[in-house]
Amino acid sequence: MSASMWDWTKRVTPCFCIAATRSSTQGSIQATGNSTFTPTADRRMIDGGEHINIVSYGGGANSTALLIGLHQHRIPVDLILFADTGGEHPHTYAYLDIMDRWLKDHGMPEITRVYKTTKDGRRLTLEDECLKSGTLPSIAYGFKRCSLKHKIGPQEKFCNNYPPCRKVWVSGKKVVKFIGYDAGEHYRSDKVLLRNLADPKYSKWYPLMEWGWDREACIRAIEAAGLPQPGKSSCFFCPSMRAEEIIDLREHYPDLFRRALAMEDNARANLKTVQGLGRNYSWRERFGKEFI
């Protein structure tokens, strides 16, 4: 086990441990200015007992703006998780390093990267899983199992074995989880509201909505913070990619494009309801006939 991993992982059985490639430090936010939004900062002081605030960082504009806003509003953040499928776009991996430097400079914890593992503790990427099973990412078939297994699952297992989270749950309280839905995405929060209220483990908050930050406001906040704009966060073989994004991948990252085509070719014999990564069309037929 890597020396950079949390000490507590030594006490977790291999079949249940989610490895982290970067440790996170606890710390309060150092910031100035007036705060008009305090959904948890006040509650942490009023309720007493154990508390922990976590952010699921996706590497895109909304979750980046969320971290910036939490800092501006002096709302403590104790843990920032990024679930790595192993197939993120290169610009996403590069932005994680940029964001880590910004977080460190602003007294916030660095990003803890987690990923799916097999029962014997080996890492399992989404790409490897698809190649082994001869299938495409489940979103190609209209499902979201790839996100559940490689994004939500690893973060949930990490929290289940993270002592500060366990301590909160043992005390009978909920872990506070900040969600980066912007002010233009009320339809998303409305759909999950009842499920959130019934969640025995997490109290979920939507700060961007309460601040009134829509997509444009998020972009402005990132610019004002002196950060470059993050690119779209997704796997390089995501069936939801638009044609121009696929062409951009082919032109700038031909090796990754070939890997996406190899996944599609590998699954071809098993495809019954879709044509390929484009769902109703094949990436190879439309964009990659000349690629071997």
Language-model segments: what does each one mean?
Residues 1-2, 217:
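Conserved short secondary-structure elements within globular domains
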Residues 15-40:
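Short metal-binding segments enriched for Cys and/or His
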Residues 44-292:
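Nucleotide-activated chemistry modules centered on ATP-dependent adenylation/adenylyltransferase
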Residues 2-6, 23-26, 244:
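Short, non-ligating residues that shape and space the ligands of small metal-coordination modules
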Residues 1, 19-22, 237:
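Short, cysteine/histidine-rich loop/knuckle motifs that typically chelate Zn2+
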Residues 3-15:
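Short linker/helix segments within small regulatory modules
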